Amino acid sequence: MDFLLFLFCLNLFIHLFDKYVKTFLVNQGFRVYARFSGSPEFKSYNDLRLQLLSTKRDLNNVSAQDEFAKWARLNRKFDQLNVKWEKQSKIVSQKSEGVKKLISLTFWIVTRGYRFIVQFKNSGNPVFAVPEGMLPTWALWFLALPKAKTGYVSVAVWNFASQKVISTLL
């Protein structure tokens, strides 16, 4: 019974982690990577963003009617910075997709890998017994796949069933 609850809680944890926590941790992991990687793409992206915001602030403080020459110069500078920033933004987004995929893959391997190891090591152990006469022989055989004795529910079948119940209910 303890093993049955352990497997159910493991599947519940993996489902809740994937649904609610994983995206947040992937984004935070990317932010940490971007801050401490020392990559010139991220540095120039942040520098351009700060220059763009500073120029936009200056542009908003200047009246277009009273100081047209200054406003036009700032507007041209803002447009040039905006074009550079958009180009740099595409580069950073491509790099961020790669880093986020790597972090997501790591989380997937850790969560699914642990479940796979538990399932593999306990593949011959039954989770619980099905009462005699409740199901036909072919159904008992199917529930015992891959290695449990006929008449018992295997770890693989229990994991599959608990995953489906959890994903349906949550």
UniProtKB/Swiss-Prot annotation:
Topology in the lipid bilayer: Multi-pass membrane protein
Keywords: Endoplasmic reticulum, Membrane, Transmembrane, Transmembrane helix, Transport
Lumenal-side positions: 1-3, 129-152
Keyword Transmembrane: yes
Record-linked InterPro entries: Get1, Get1_fungi, Helix_hairpin_bin_sf
Chief location bin: endoplasmic reticulum
Transmembrane segments: 4-23, 108-128, 153-169
Annotated function: Required for the post-translational delivery of tail-anchored (TA) proteins to the endoplasmic reticulum. Acts as a membrane receptor for soluble get3, which recognizes and selectively binds the transmembrane domain of TA proteins in the cytosol.
Subunit structure: Interacts with get3.
Protein name, as recorded: Protein get1
